[in-house]
């Protein structure tokens, strides 16, 4: 497989078996392991900007498509994302890693830190989801309602994805026209591809989670939390809850960004993530 990063590093990609399926992954570099976990309806490509410099900074970087996303298997029954991640780490012979997640990826990272604490050396949680916490923001709930209404309609996929973009790209404080069109189209393409590829998995099973909301104080690894100042109040509340409950956690408020903080304010996100990783080596 030809890959745009192949020119500067030895890149390995492939699949690893999981229960009732397989995960597609890419890995490159040498050094302490860093795993990148993508947001819901997206895939590992959302980390393109970070993958390159992380490899160059002396890390073994791993990114993968979670079950029901990208090039990984469609869900066929109930599953646990945190167990899938540990199966990937086992296959790649990685005893523990720094987990860097966004949204759904943060949710999986937190569950992994609680269910398998020996596999997690640190957490970088962007626009964090937390298992066991429900959405309450009327902005988010309204768009979820519209997504449900779109299911089965002739133009249902297009409408469903557009409401996804309104929630998780534009955010509650901007119109679509206020957002860089390239970002919207990049996320639209990923979300549409995942929805089309994994349509058969809708309703086939549910992710089994640990209910992290009531257990945040149990986390005992260095943690940094990122949230955009243009994101939903639900995400801001999650970031605040993590900062209060996780011992030593630090919060980075990202200006000029909604949910996709690593893509909307890449310079600040990369600077803070680099500083966090450097602090782990001291």
Language-model-derived ranges and their functions:
Residues 14, 19-73, 88:
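Conserved HGGG/HGGXW glycine-rich cap/lid loop of the alpha/beta-hydrolase fold
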Residues 80-97:
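Conserved acidic catalytic loop of the alpha/beta-hydrolase fold
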Residues 99-101, 126:
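Short beta-strand immediately N-terminal to the catalytic nucleophile in serine-hydrolase-like folds
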Residues 101, 105, 109:
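Gly/Ala-rich beta-loop-alpha elbow adjacent to hydrolase catalytic centers
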Residues 114-115, 121-153:
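Flexible "cap/lid" loop of the alpha/beta hydrolase fold
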Residues 154-210:
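Conserved alpha/beta-hydrolase catalytic His-Asp/Glu region
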Residues 188-244, 253:
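Conserved serine/cysteine hydrolase catalytic core
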Residues 247-282:
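Catalytic active-site module of serine/aspartate enzymes centered on a nucleophile-bearing elbow/loop
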